[in-house]
Amino acid sequence: MREIVLTQAGQCGNQIGAKFWEVISDEHAIDSAGTYHGDSRLQLERIDVYYNEACGGRYVPRAVLVDLEPGTLDSVRSGPFGQIFRPDSFIFGQCGAGNNWAKGHYTEGAELMESVMDVVRKEAESCDCLQGFQLTHSLGGGTGSGMGTLLLSKIREEYPDRIINTFSILPSPKVSDTVVEPYNATLSVHQLIENADETFCIDNEALYDICSRTLKLPTPTYGDLNHLVSATMSGVTTCLRFPGQLNADLRKLAVNMVPFPRLHFFMPGFAPLTSRGSQQYRALTVAELTQQMFDARNMMAACDPRHGRYLTAAAIFRGRMPMREVDEQMFNIQNKNSSYFADWLPHNVKTAVCDIPPRGLKMSATFIGNNTAIQELFKRVSEQFTAMFRRKAFLHWYTGEGMDEMEFTEAESNMNDLVSEYQQYQDATAEEEEFEEYAEEEEA
């Protein structure tokens, strides 16, 4: 049917990817060896979106796992679901990118690229009707950002008409693990603007906040953060994998969510937020789900949607629920908060409903917002970038790999343009044009 190939680049991308495969293998009742142990026809009906059926009825993920050092991939391989992947889906170098975007994009990463693309082609050829690619990576490191964006541009070259969406972990305002994060992130965003169709911006700080504030976890681990990300990733593709009353796929999402090609950076949210292993004591109502889903505290990007306006949004509900109630609640929220929605885009919220809830919940909702407040995220990175670039700090690491300073300047101005485009549409209203036309008529 409509297959998706998942590519994972770098340490962060592979850890999130591994968690994601655990989550959806559980949803489709597939054990760590790739054998099906379920009792529902629905679990197998569209399993081919993410899995290839191999001989002996084993299901193998359509995954490409890439890293420039063997460490992370070794731990994925020895992890709980390590045996489910095809051995030749693992492609790794030996020397690492050392948090250097240029190493990932131009030198070390470029050397591995041919063998990575071979695996991507092999996966794409085994598809019946390939819908698109998903990439999980972080923008702060070297491999996920540098090599991840190189992989994107290669895929875009070979498969120009397929949808590419990325789950990109952006540097956080307070939590930083690398000094050169602003450089790597800016150079990556520059690539994402041009080559991705949809980018889900997730950042660790927002995830930490959700874990400590909402889930009351005293010391959140990366495992907890990745659990949140994989819940969102699974929600975004639910409609492809399970039957529903209103379906959405990657392309429908893109068409409904992207009003202008450059503005494809979304903030995801998820409801209800529950910590790993905890059960919900009562089922939430559709109204509570909708409230929680639009709540600023549920956003997985560290920016406040109340500071901007929604150009578009999508809500994907899971579980048995009356359609009428869903429509009413979505209508209510737009009515009550109309100032937060762009009035020149009427009916700008897309809804999808899928009948199968995630494990352990009666119903859940995944939220995707294209909100102009996302500019806060890019502004923050841009300020840090400018502070360092003005002094040319750390630049020798990049120029030493053959990069030119011009590339930095271009990336910086492209990101600043993106910020001002978001600002322009945040200020736009439906009435402006009418006044202009009226004034022209008066003059005539």
From Swiss-Prot:
Q: How is it modified after translation?
A: Some glutamate residues at the C-terminus are polyglycylated, resulting in polyglycine chains on the gamma-carboxyl group. Glycylation is mainly limited to tubulin incorporated into axonemes (cilia and flagella) whereas glutamylation is prevalent in neuronal cells, centrioles, axonemes, and the mitotic spindle. Both modifications can coexist on the same protein on adjacent residues, and lowering polyglycylation levels increases polyglutamylation, and reciprocally. Cilia and flagella glycylation is required for their stability and maintenance. Flagella glycylation controls sperm motility.
Q: Name one GO biological process term.
A: spindle assembly involved in female meiosis
PTM 5-glutamyl polyglutamate: list the residues. Answer: 436
- Residues spanned by motif MREI motif: 1-4
This protein's source sits in the domain of life called: Eukaryota
Q: Which UniProt keywords apply?
A: Cytoplasm, Cytoskeleton, GTP-binding, Isopeptide bond, Magnesium, Metal-binding, Microtubule, Nucleotide-binding, Phosphoprotein
List of residues binding Mg(2+): 69
Q: Name one GO cellular component term.
A: intercellular bridge
Function noted in UniProt: Tubulin is the major constituent of microtubules, a cylinder consisting of laterally associated linear protofilaments composed of alpha- and beta-tubulin heterodimers. Microtubules grow by the addition of GTP-tubulin dimers to the microtubule end, where a stabilizing cap forms. Below the cap, tubulin dimers are in GDP-bound state, owing to GTPase activity of alpha-tubulin. Has a key role in meiotic spindle assembly and oocyte maturation.
Q: What is this protein called?
A: Tubulin beta-8 chain
Provenance organism: Papio hamadryas
